[in-house]
């Protein structure tokens, strides 16, 4: 579970923080469709990358809702990804130009995107080189499936 990621982060002197949107008592709960095992796999791949490419600062996991989706956003203070590489990071064997010294074949994001697309969800990336990245996992809510 999450503990192993906390330990990996701690080994690099990084903290993983959680933030959620505070719900008012009257707010209806949001129901989203996802497969727990595969969703954790997708989130895990993103966390692994965040830890691998962040040397100072930390990682924040935020729960939010956006239009008809429930989302989990993972923000890091890592090396960031240039705009021209955004599409490529989801490729099957991608490893960034800036990360030649790191080990491992980048199948993680390819798999994460594939997993998210199964229930009709998606992944969004926003990033600034040298400042960090945010990967958003968007899960369809109950309303979407009725459309």
For each of these PLM feature ranges, what is it?
Residues 7, 79-80:
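Glycine-rich G1-box
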Residues 58-68:
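Short beta-strand/loop element within the Bergerat-fold HATPase_c
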Residues 120-121:
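Conserved glycine-rich
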Residues 50-51:
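Short helix-loop "hinge" at the ATP-lid/N-box region of the Bergerat-fold HATPase_c
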């Amino acid at each position: 579970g999450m503990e192993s990621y906390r330990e990996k982060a701690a080994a690099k002197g990084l903290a993983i923080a959680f933030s959620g949107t505070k719900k008012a008592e009257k707010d209806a709960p949001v129901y989203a469709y996802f497969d727990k095992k595969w969703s954790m796999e997708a989130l895990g791949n993103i966390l692994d990358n965040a830890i691998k490419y962040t040397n100072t600062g930390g990682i924040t996991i935020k729960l939010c809702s956006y239009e008809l989706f429930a989302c989990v956003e993972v923000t890091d203070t890592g090396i960031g990804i240039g705009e021209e590489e955004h599409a490529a990071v989801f490729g099957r064997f991608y490893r960034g130009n800036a990360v030649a010294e790191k080990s491992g074949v980048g199948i993680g994001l390819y798999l994460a995107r594939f997993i998210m697309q199964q229930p009709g969800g998606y992944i969004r990336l926003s990033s600034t080189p040298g400042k960090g990245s945010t990967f958003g996992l968007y899960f369809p809510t109950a309303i979407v499936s009725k459309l």
